[in-house]
């Protein structure tokens, strides 16, 4: 008997679509009114058209981005997944008024997604990133100063 939860298959296919940079496959797994919220950057997209624009931006900034799931927790209607992303920045990145230029160096950072489902479709995706680790990986060496200047 297979004890795998049905959402485990959905989230595995979702991860494959992200790693394949297949925007249409990603969107096909979302409800029409799905919400994509990045709690680290503050960005929010509501609906597939807005989510498409977020995805285009992510894949343009990090054309080789890949997510590796570290742990996945599945309950009825909810998936929480811890992951490590690895990518090479392809465009300038600005935080706190400071801009880092692409270096060609591959970086990695950790995060967590909280994903409520409506049936087998993603109703919402809440993304939480280790922002200090992400900024350090990008080369922001004075991260504390950036955070303090934004208060």
Region spans (language model):
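A short gly/proline-enriched turn/hairpin at secondary-structure junctions
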Residues: 29, 35-46, 57-61
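A beta-strand edge to alpha-helix "cap/lid" segment located at domain peripheries
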Residues: 1-6, 22-25, 56-151
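Short, aromatic-enriched amphipathic alpha-helices that serve as compact interaction elements
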Residues: 3-21, 29
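Short beta-edge strand/loop motif at the mouth of beta-sheet-based domains
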Residues: 43-53, 74
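An amphipathic alpha-helix signature
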Residues: 23-27, 32, 48, 52
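Structured beta->alpha junctions
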Residues: 15, 40, 71-73
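A structural signal for well-ordered alpha-helical scaffolds and beta->alpha junctions
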Residues: 11, 48-51, 65, 108
